[in-house]
């Protein structure tokens, strides 16, 4: 990323000193993203202990995930509109999210009853969901000429959190009770709150924005205009279909490795780690390529490739070499498509509605993907193979729709930040998926 430092000051009027550098902005926001993923993934690792402590059924465990998805999905749309309005206070928004995150874990850690855990879960989900909005908007704004790469790096922060969490949390669980560990974990975000505020207190400020205060009605009008943008709505649909496939993929892949291939817990973990590790390497590369050659040139072959690999998984997974090879190949695209889709959406919108656009993307992904694990589960009960055909089909349909969407020509990194494509002033800002709930969050 360092190669473009000389472009960056165009859009970083507000940042002071060390906090002005491209490396600092990307590094800081990416690290924060990793913290959110680390904790969310750690809680999933602790799920058997939580289940036993509260005597939960499968429905009770599902209720925790549903609460997380509901809270993060519902808050994303109003959160996006408010984030765009509060642009000068993005540092405050990020710091508040980090504090709320710690508070949510504290509630979960000291909770004597199940309903209180749901409250903590909702707090955590809202904090993680809203963090993505200013963070990705800022990255998209500061790195508008290499938006795909910047958003991909942010995504990698989450993936690193996902990869490390099970190992560290599993190790610590051997030494202490789950609720003690969560209470200790909760202290970290509370301390980090101050660091986040110091680092990003000037993030959304710039000379232009200082003079404009957008009224709520004007912001709503600008937001409503997004729903009249046909290309944006189609990209949102593609992102939703991709979300449907993704949220069904990882849990049922884990079940498949257990049920059909009889792998041990350690072996399952190792196989799923292959996916993530390959993703960490390939995601920034794919983001960079999408900046250089265009979003569709990377996304469409990638989605078709995932579909084909998913279909091949069923007949070839009995051979351990083939299984590892297919998982590694899946990892090349499985995580990298989301930040590129986000970048493609942000390429189409103007200054001032980036966080709202991100909110729309998250909200639609939430609406579409909410039922997907249930559909996948019903198919899994009929025939394990059908679940994978369903996932492959979703990727195929998404690729076909994407093929039909005319996207603007990507401006290469040599161009000035403020010359947008599609005639929109390419100074827009953006947000990650978030897969917050799925994590992809």
Question: What is the role of each PLM region?
Answer:
Residues 3, 200-221, 411-424:
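Flexible cytoplasmic inter-helical loops of multi-pass small-molecule transporters
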Residues 74-112, 290-296:
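Conserved MFS/SLC helix-loop-helix module at the cytosolic interface between two early adjacent transmembrane helices
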Residues 120-158:
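Cytoplasmic helix-loop-helix junction between adjacent transmembrane helices
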Residues 162, 351-382:
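A late C-terminal transmembrane helix in Major Facilitator Superfamily
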Residues 295-341:
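C-terminal transmembrane helical hairpin of 12-TM major facilitator-type secondary transporters
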């Amino acid at each position: 990323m360092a190669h473009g430092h000389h472009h960056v000051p165009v859009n970083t009027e507000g940042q002071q000193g060390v906090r002005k550098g491209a490396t600092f902005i990307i590094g800081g926001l990416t690290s924060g993203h990793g913290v959110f993923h680390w904790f969310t993934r750690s809680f999933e690792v602790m799920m058997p202990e939580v289940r036993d402590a509260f005597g939960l059924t499968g429905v009770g465990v599902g209720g925790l995930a549903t609460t997380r998805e509901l809270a993060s999905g519902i808050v994303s749309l109003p959160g996006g509109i408010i984030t765009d309005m509060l642009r000068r206070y993005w540092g405050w928004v990020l710091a508040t999210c980090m504090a709320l995150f710690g508070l949510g874990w504290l509630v979960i850690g000291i909770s004597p009853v199940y309903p209180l855990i749901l409250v903590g879960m909702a707090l955590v989900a809202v904090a993680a969901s809203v963090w993505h909005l200013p963070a990705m908007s800022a990255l998209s704004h500061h790195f508008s000429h290499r938006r795909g790469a910047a958003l991909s790096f942010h995504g990698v922060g989450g993936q690193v959190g996902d990869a490390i969490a099970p190992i560290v949390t599993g190790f610590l669980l051997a030494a202490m009770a789950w609720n003690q560990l969560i209470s200790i974990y909760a202290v970290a975000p509370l301390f980090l709150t101050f660091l986040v505020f110091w680092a990003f207190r000037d993030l959304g400020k710039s000379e232009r924005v200082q003079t404009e205060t957008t009224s709520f009605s004007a912001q709503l009008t600008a937001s409503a205009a997004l729903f009249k943008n046909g290309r944006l709505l189609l990209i949102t649909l593609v992102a939703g279909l991709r979300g449907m496939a993704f949220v069904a993929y990882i849990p049922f892949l884990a079940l498949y490795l257990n049920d059909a291939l009889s792998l041990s817990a350690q072996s399952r973990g190792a196989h799923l780690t292959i996916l993530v590790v390959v993703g960490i390497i390939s995601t920034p590369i794919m983001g960079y390529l999408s900046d250089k050659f265009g979003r569709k040139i990377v996304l469409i072959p990638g989605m078709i490739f995932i579909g084909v690999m998913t279909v091949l998984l069923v007949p070839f997974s009995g051979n351990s070499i083939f299984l590892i090879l297919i998982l590694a190949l899946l990892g090349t695209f499985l995580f990298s498509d989301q930040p590129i889709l986000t970048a493609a959406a942000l390429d189409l919108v103007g200054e001032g509605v980036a966080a709202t656009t991100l909110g729309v993307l998250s909200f639609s992904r939430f609406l579409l993907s909410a039922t997907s694990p249930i559909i996948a589960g019903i198919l899994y009960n009929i025939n394990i193979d059908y679940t994978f055909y369903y996932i492959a089909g979703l990727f195929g349909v998404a690729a076909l729709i994407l093929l039909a969407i005319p996207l603007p020509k990507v401006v290469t990194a040599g161009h000035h930040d403020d010359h947008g494509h599609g005639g929109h002033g390419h100074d827009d800002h953006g947000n990650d998926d978030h897969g917050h709930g799925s994590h992809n969050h």
